[in-house]
């Protein structure tokens, strides 16, 4: 039985979510006396990180193959890291989850939205984030941030047009989700950081009262 709090951070490449999580990981190890574990997808545990490395190498794989590899990584990640943490009443904060698969593999790479959603249902077995925070960013700002990276991979969205398509897909999928909050990630990084930490802190405190 899940006891902890599962929080997912989503957003287009260049939204600042990964930088946010690196900073939060350094500054917050617990909230309201609840320990926090941080993770990412694909990855998060030994087997899942190995699958991540494989995904990064396979730039020309079929979109459904890629979606299945993400599912394999996610299954191991949930079993080995996320679910044990939640069962120990910890806060699990993850960089990306199933919504990323729906959008990137299902819609953008045309593996089929319903197909990708269905195969992920087998893996997640009904588990949903208690809170999803979408870092919504102006495509021009995201594209600039990506261009300034020292390294990039084939999963990164390079053009403003592609970023905008992904952004719109995120907004469409999450706009009516009562467990999702959309924040303006085009603001300066310190403002975004303070805002999101406050959202997470208040959510965890209110979650304990319910």
Curated annotation (Swiss-Prot):
Enzyme class at the top of the EC tree: transferase
CDD domains in the cross-refs: TMPK
PANTHER family the UniProt entry points to: THYMIDYLATE KINASE, UMP-CMP KINASE 2, MITOCHONDRIAL
Keywords: ATP-binding, Kinase, Nucleotide biosynthesis, Nucleotide-binding, Transferase
E.C. number: 2.7.4.9
UniProt GO MF annotations: ATP binding; dTMP kinase activity
Lineage: Bacteria, Bacillati, Mycoplasmatota, Mycoplasmoidales, Mycoplasmoidaceae
UniProt-listed SUPFAM superfamilies: P-loop containing nucleoside triphosphate hydrolases
Function: Phosphorylation of dTMP to form dTDP in both de novo and salvage pathways of dTTP synthesis.
Family annotation (Gene3D superfamilies): P-loop containing nucleotide triphosphate hydrolases
Coiled-coil intervals: none
Pfam families: Thymidylate_kin (PF02223)
One GO BP: dUDP biosynthetic process
Entry binding sites for ATP: 11-18
Descriptive protein name: Thymidylate kinase
Annotated GO CC locations: cytosol
Reactions mediated catalytically: dTMP + ATP = dTDP + ADP
Family membership: Belongs to the thymidylate kinase family.
Keyword Transferase: yes
């Amino acid at each position: 039985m899940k006891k902890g709090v599962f929080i997912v951070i989503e957003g287009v490449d260049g939204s600042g979510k990964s930088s946010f999580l690196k900073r939060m990981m350094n500054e917050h190890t617990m909230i309201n006396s609840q320990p926090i574990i941080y993770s990412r997808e694909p990855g998060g545990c030994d087997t899942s990180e190995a699958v991540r490395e494989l995904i990064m190498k396979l730039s020309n794989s079929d979109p459904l193959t890629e979606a299945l590899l993400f599912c394999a990584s996610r299954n191991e990640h949930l079993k080995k890291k996320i679910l044990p943490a939640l069962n120990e009443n910890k806060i699990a904060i993850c960089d990306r989850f199933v919504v990323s698969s729906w959008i990137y593999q299902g819609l953008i790479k045309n593996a089929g939205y319903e197909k990708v959603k269905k195969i992920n249902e087998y893996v997640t077995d009904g588990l949903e984030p208690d809170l999803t925070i979408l870092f919504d960013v102006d495509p021009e700002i995201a594209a600039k941030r990506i261009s300034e990276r020292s390294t990039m991979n084939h999963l990164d969205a390079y053009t403003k047009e592609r970023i905008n398509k992904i952004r719109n897909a995120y907004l469409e999928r999450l706009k009516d989700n009562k467990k999702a909050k959309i924040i303006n990630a085009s603001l300066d990084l310190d403002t975004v950081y303070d805002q999101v930490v406050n959202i997470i802190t208040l959510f965890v405190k209110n979650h304990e009262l319910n």
